[in-house]
Structure formats: structure tokens, C-alpha cells
UniProtKB/Swiss-Prot annotation:
Any one GO CC term of the record: cytoplasm
Principal location class: cytoplasm
Subcellular location: Cytoplasm
Subunit-level organization: Heteromultimer composed of HisG and HisZ subunits.
Lineage of the organism: Bacteria, Pseudomonadati, Pseudomonadota, Gammaproteobacteria, Moraxellales
The keyword Cell membrane is assigned to this record: no
Protein name according to UniProt: ATP phosphoribosyltransferase regulatory subunit
Length: 387
């Protein structure tokens, strides 16, 4: 019996998943991203350093039998990339990619997996929006190469707008959390009432009421907000990224500046990519801070941006070419002499190099599932024919 949210990936699905993983990683490598493969387990002081409460809850903990110290089984690979960059990233721009299993204590959503195959890419050391645009371009290049059955819809946000307003209004932690909860619940009537008692309350309400209209959002904010460089920059970044997605990738884009689910982790642009009517995003990404680098005199966090996805979520939206499954005629080869057998093995090797799946049967009843072709001996020549 398997736990809820844990499934076997079998046969053609397992083959498809591995093909997709390999194809996507090769795409990332071809764009200049360095492949890394961190371990499944780490001591929690490094694995969960600076982690959100949600990530801590999602992480299984175990006791190291060698040292007695607490270890965690990774629930997300990104914190491991932060550690790797802090030790090896230097002070220049660094690009990383990865693909590996992660394990969650709880599933994401009603039918979510607790064992995703997480694949992602990240850029460290570049504070400019050019890095976010590059990642978007890489993501769409990857997905377009798969010829997916449906188009991706992207929902953009920018946590820096709300963060800066909260700083200007000197909001307490409880007021900040209350606003975030009201935003998440889309509760405009209660939000309006709460905002009446807050400094810059009209701005916080405007984010929820008009935040989707990014072209006109700045003009609806208060004069203080309109003159704040951080808010102006954030809105400009959203407009530029939205325009790039629409022009370069003909992508449907929506804006939600009150999408703050990663508020305690993200620092700027955030995006979720959805497909069809699925409620859980296929891909998540955004800006965040790396660790303070051991190699930098300033000891400042490295700015970073990245995205990740669960490769198994792609299975339902992609198709591979139907495999050619070949069975060698058992009766024809079981009594072959060594010279004739060697010729057969050479032909089998040639077929396998061409991508055919060739089974050399052990008995007459050894027939592969889904067989499409048979390799038979006709007039002393091995010939391939469909069945």
C-alpha cells in the first residue's frame, strides 16, 4: 500500500517522464545553465536556513545515525542551490539547472503529489529584469519544444509593491498578515473597512481593486506612492514583462499584485504558469535573495531569480512518438550457429541504435507488451515486418 499522494510511475509513463527530464535538462544546458545534483538529505541547519514556515512543515526530518544530528529530506531543491552558489558562485553571474526528486510531508492541493520530480533553473548575481526575461524565454523555449497540447497562461505579480507600501505605512506584523489574508480571500468589503483605519489605506485597497490594470495602477495610487522609486520601478517591470510575454510568445497574461503567497521568500517579480483549467500552477518562479556569499567582501545576499516545475505534471500534456517494439522470431534464432547468431546480433544492435526496442526472447512465450514488429528469418535474411 502506498500513502496518499504517492504513486508508482510505470512503463510508458516512466519512459515518457525520463525522456522529458533528459530533453528539458539538455535544453537548459544548451542555454548555458550548469547542471548540479545536490543530495536528497542535508543537516537541517543548512537545508532549512532562512526557510519559510511552510517549507519547514513540508520537510521530513530524520536523525543522523552517525552523529545524532537532525537531518531533513529535501522538499525543495532551491535552498540547496542557494548553498551551492554561496560556496561556488563567486561575484559574477551564475546559472544553474537541476532535476531531482523531492518529498513533501503533505500534498499540494486535493490531488497533489508528495513526490514531485522537480526541475528548475536559476540565475544568481543579476539584479536587472534582463535575467527574469531570459528565464521566461528559456522556459517557453523548453515547453514549446515539447509541442504541448495546450498553451500556458501566465499570472504575473510583484511582491515589492506591497512590501514597499507596508514600509511607507510602517505597518505592524499583525496588520501586514491581516491584509495578506484578506487579499488571499479576495474579500473586498472587509478589506475596504480594514483599510480605512490604516495609513495609506486607500493604496492597499487600490492594489486589490485595480491591481490587475497595471497600465493605470500607478495613477490610481496616492501621491506618496506615485513618487516612490521602488514602486515605480516595480510597476514598470511588470509592464515590460507582460509586454514581452505577449509580443515574443503570444502568451495570455494576467496581473495580480496581491499574489503574496511567497511574500516571506520572494523579493520582486513572481509568476505562475497555468495550463487548461488546472488550479495548481504547472510552473512557479520569481525573484529571491541568495545567501550571503563566502567569497564577497560586502557579505550581502546575492540577488537571484528562477523557476521550477514538477516534470510528472507534463505527462498529461505531451505525447511521444509511438515506440517500435520488435520481437526476434524465437524459433528462427534458437538453434542458430555462432556465425549466424553473430550476424543477427549485429542487426539487433543496429536496430537498437536507431531507437527500436528489440527483445531477444528467452522462450517461445516471451512476447513483449505492445509488440509492433517481428524480426524474422526469410530466405536466410533477417527482415523486419509489422504485425
Amino acid at each position: 500500500m502506498l500513502p496518499d499522494g504517492v504513486v508508482d510511475v510505470l512503463f510508458e509513463d516512466a519512459h515518457k517522464q525520463e525522456v522529458l527530464r533528459h530533453q528539458l535538462i539538455q535544453q537548459l544546458i544548451s542555454h548555458g545553465y550548469q547542471l548540479v545534483n545536490p543530495p536528497m538529505i542535508e543537516f537541517t541547519e543548512s537545508l532549512l536556513s532562512g526557510a519559510s514556515e511552510d517549507l519547514k512543515r513540508q520537510t521530513f526530518k530524520i536523525i543522523d545515525q552517525l552523529t545524532g544530528r537532525l537531518m531533513g529530506i529535501r522538499a525543495d531543491i532551491t535552498p540547496q542551490i542557494l548553498r551551492i552558489d554561496a560556496h561556488h558562485g563567486g561575484d559574477g553571474i551564475a546559472r544553474y539547472c537541476y532535476a531531482g526528486d523531492v518529498i513533501h510531508t503533505l500534498p499540494s492541493g486535493l490531488f497533489g503529489s508528495r513526490t514531485p520530480l522537480q526541475l528548475g533553473a536559476e540565475i544568481f548575481g543579476c539584479e536587472y529584469i534582463a535575467a527574469d526575461i531570459e528565464l521566461i524565454d528559456v522556459l517557453f523555449s523548453m515547453l514549446n519544444s515539447l509541442e504541448m497540447s495546450a498553451a500556458l497562461h501566465v499570472d504575473l505579480g510583484h511582491v515589492a509593491i506591497f512590501k514597499r507600501l507596508a514600509e511607507l505605512a510602517v505597518l505592524s506584523e499583525s496588520d501586514t498578515e491581516q491584509l495578506m489574508q484578506l487579499y488571499a480571500n479576495k474579500n473586498l468589503p472587509e478589506l475596504k473597512q480594514v483599510c480605512q483605519a490604516l495609513p495609506l489605506g486607500s493604496d492597499f485597497y487600490t492594489l486589490a481593486r485595480f491591481g490587475h490594470d497595471i497600465a493605470n495602477l500607478l495613477g490610481r495610487l496616492s501621491e506618496n506612492a506615485q513618487q516612490d522609486a521602488q514602486i515605480v520601478t516595480a510597476i514598470d517591470e511588470l509592464q515590460r514583462l507582460k509586454a514581452h510575454l505577449q509580443v515574443q510568445w503570444q502568451c495570455a497574461v494576467s496581473i495580480d499584485v496581491t499574489e503574496l503567497s511567497g511574500y516571506h521568500y520572494h523579493t520582486g517579480i513572481v509568476f505562475n504558469g497555468y495550463i487548461n483549467s488546472e488550479t495548481q500552477p504547472l510552473v512557479r518562479g520569481g525573484r529571491f535573495d541568495g545567501m550571503k556569499s563566502n567569497q564577497l567582501a560586502t557579505n550581502q545576499p546575492r540577488q537571484a531569480t528562477g523557476f521550477s516545475m514538477d516534470v510528472s505534471r507534463l505527462l498529461a500534456h505531451t505525447q511521444l512518438d509511438a515506440p517500435v517494439i520488435v520481437l526476434v522470431d524465437y524459433d528462427a534464432f534458437k538453434d542458430l550457429g555462432s556465425e549466424q547468431l553473430q550476424l543477427l546480433l549485429q542487426q539487433v544492435a543496429s536496430l537498437r541504435q536507431q531507437g527500436y526496442r528489440v527483445t531477444m526472447p528467452l522462450t517461445a512465450k516471451d512476447i513483449p507488451v505492445g509488440m509492433t514488429h517481428r524480426l524474422s528469418l526469410v530466405d536466410n535474411q533477417w527482415q523486419l515486418h509489422a504485425v
